[in-house]
Each structure stands twice: as C-alpha cells, then as structure tokens.
C-alpha cells in the first residue's frame, strides 16, 4: 500500500492510457494509504477541472436560442459543481505543499471560476511570492 506506487499506477491509467475512471481508482487508493499525498490530491482535483473543461466545450457549441439558453444554464451549473468539487483536493494539496506553483495556480483558477475572488487574489499573491523567492 505504498502511496507513490499507487499514485504512479493511477497516473499511468489517467494520462497514458486515457482511462480516467481507473486513474481515479488508484489516486483514491493512494489517498487511502496517505490522505495527505499531495500529488494524488492535485491530480484528483485536476480531473474535476478537466471534466469542467469538457462541459465548457459543450457550452461553446450551443447556438443562441431559447432552448440552447436553458441547456447552457444546466451546463453552467454542472461546470460550477465540478469546479467546486476540485477545491477540497487542491486546498489539501496546498496545505501539504504550500510552495507548489502548479497547485497554487490551479487553486487560484478554481477560486476565480467559482467566483471566490478574495480567495483567488490571496492565492495569486502567494504564488507571486513563491515565484519571486525562486528567482
């Protein structure tokens, strides 16, 4: 039950084999082995973001008609729900590794897209400080 081993299997399924469900299964197993495993937390959150991006693609294909407006509103609600689901994973990954730029950027973006502007600005400032420190 080595979390690194389980994470790596999840990553291979998710990214190399494009089997998201199997990737999730192994990311979750990694998180059972170590609930604070930052990489698995990040990737689990990223899957929600990827799913929300797929919803946005569907939204962008809609025409400008009354029926399409109703469908757009349904999809927008789904998109926001997916993004909200990513937040706890990114927040926990951030707590475990507060100087990881990818996590900070993902958290900022999800806060922004879920209209949590104060949180987005706070995380942006933190990311800017980390970037400045690494120069």
Segments predicted by a language model, with ranges:
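Residue-level recognition of tetratricopeptide repeat
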Residues: 1-2, 37, 100, 134
